[in-house]
């Protein structure tokens, strides 16, 4: 890690993703998409978690490793919660043609339908679902920061609207949590 001219810690130069990263490599690989986002390639099953590949409302300190139009296929996008640094409406919309499914909490699934015309699969905390051979469990995440600010108290923010994910693959267990 290095520090930029503003005194901010910044990641090293971005490693661009290529078509090869979407191929079945016989194991599980994890790619950082920037911020809280990751792509998992497990035996050729492609999962993107909280991909913010475009449409973020603040300047980024990195170059994004892949643009939505460069993504070849996604078996599922998983979204942990509705904050714009995890749920990019623009990215989700622009992945629709290559994405087979979207999985998230019930609340975020309702936003996906309303805002993006995406039929997201809503789940409760502790629910399990399968993507190929991958078992995915929604885990609790204490992230209802809106409760602390009066200006955001226009609705009740429930704990079940934010989650982490626990992925069990043939050769790896991966925990993606949110605080």
Residues of each region from the PLM?
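Short, basic/low-complexity N-terminal boundary segments at the transition from targeting/disordered tails
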Residues: 1-22, 101-108
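Pre-active-site segment of Zn-dependent metallo-hydrolases
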Residues: 13-19, 39-82, 89-94, 145-157, ...
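Beta-strand-turn-beta hairpins that frame and shape the catalytic cleft
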Residues: 22-28, 41-47, 128-137, 168-173
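Mature N-terminal segment immediately following signal peptide/propeptide cleavage
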Residues: 28-33, 38
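Active-site HxH/HxHxD metal-binding segment of metal-dependent hydrolases
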Residues: 65-129, 140-146
């Amino acid at each position: 890690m290095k520090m930029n001219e503003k005194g901010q810690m910044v990641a090293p130069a971005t490693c661009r993703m290529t078509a090869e990263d979407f191929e079945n490599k016989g194991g599980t690989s994890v790619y950082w998409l920037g911020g809280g986002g990751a792509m998992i390639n497990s035996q050729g099953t492609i999962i993107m978690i909280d991909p913010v590949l475009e449409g973020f409302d603040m300047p980024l300190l990195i170059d994004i490793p892949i643009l939505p139009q460069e993504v070849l296929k996604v078996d599922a996008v998983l979204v942990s919660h509705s904050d714009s640094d995890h749920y990019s409406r623009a990215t989700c919309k622009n992945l629709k043609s290559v994405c087979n499914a979207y999985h998230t909490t019930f609340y975020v699934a309702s936003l996906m339908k309303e805002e993006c015309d995406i039929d997201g699969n809503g789940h409760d905390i502790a629910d399990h679902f399968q993507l190929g051979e991958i078992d995915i469990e929604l885990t609790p995440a204490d992230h209802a920061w809106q409760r602390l600010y009066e200006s955001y108290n226009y609705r009740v923010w429930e704990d079940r609207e934010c989650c982490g994910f626990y992925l069990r693959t043939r050769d790896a267990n991966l925990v993606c949590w949110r605080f």
